[in-house]
């Protein structure tokens, strides 16, 4: 079993965090929309028939896919009830339906859906899953023989500037950690063929560290790690972290924030 248990929290913590963020999520989800749009563009030709969107969130990707003529049905699966409720209230295309469930338990969340979907997609969601093997096993379970898995997730260089700044203060883990590429590839190859992973760093600019940390909190993406430093976010420590990050300002006076994005494409492994 390939898991991410050293990095990530209890699944209910993630569900609660994103439910709380649902109503304000789209207001600060610039990166999420950018990655989602790139994912859809890269998947041109794949999006057809019946589609499952894992970690559908506010429904941004699901709704876009439902507008494609070649797509006949889109199921949005999310672990956060708040996200499901918000998506249902915002999107009313008859091709859409929503399901509460855990990406690590797809057969349980979608009973009777074996070999049902022509495509499973996911944009910036599976990085929150402890057990990648369970995720990919579930994806393979519900794909048709000629089906594809197409998703975007985050790599370990994500927010490396923020990690560095905290590293100038102490040795505790203040920033989310994500699995390295070799672990991701190994998990994928257990269940799929023709696996390809494109790594594309995306750098955003912020005016202040405070705005960055506020956005992360509003997105429900502040530190979820099981080994996150508890009781170590005092004013003095925060001030030192901010001072360290300030040293990274560029010539235009902006602070760099990097996200390491992995774009994945894989095909169903046919068992003979």
Give names to the regions the model predicted:
Residues 148-211, 223-230:
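Conserved catalytic/acceptor-binding region of the Class I
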Residues 119-131:
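A short SAM/SAH-binding and catalytic strip from SAM-dependent methyltransferases
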Residues 31, 58-60, 196-272:
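Conserved Class I S-adenosyl-L-methionine
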Residues 1-21:
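N-terminal, positively charged/glycine-rich alpha-helical extensions of SAM-dependent methyltransferases
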Residues 108-120:
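A short acidic, Gly/Pro-enriched loop at the edge of an enzyme's catalytic core
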Residues 133-145:
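A short glycine-rich, Lys/Arg-flanked "PGG" loop and its adjoining helix->strand segment in the class I
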Residues 52-107:
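Class I SAM-dependent methyltransferase SAM/SAH-binding core
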Residues 30-48:
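Conserved alpha-helix/loop element of class I SAM-dependent methyltransferases that forms part
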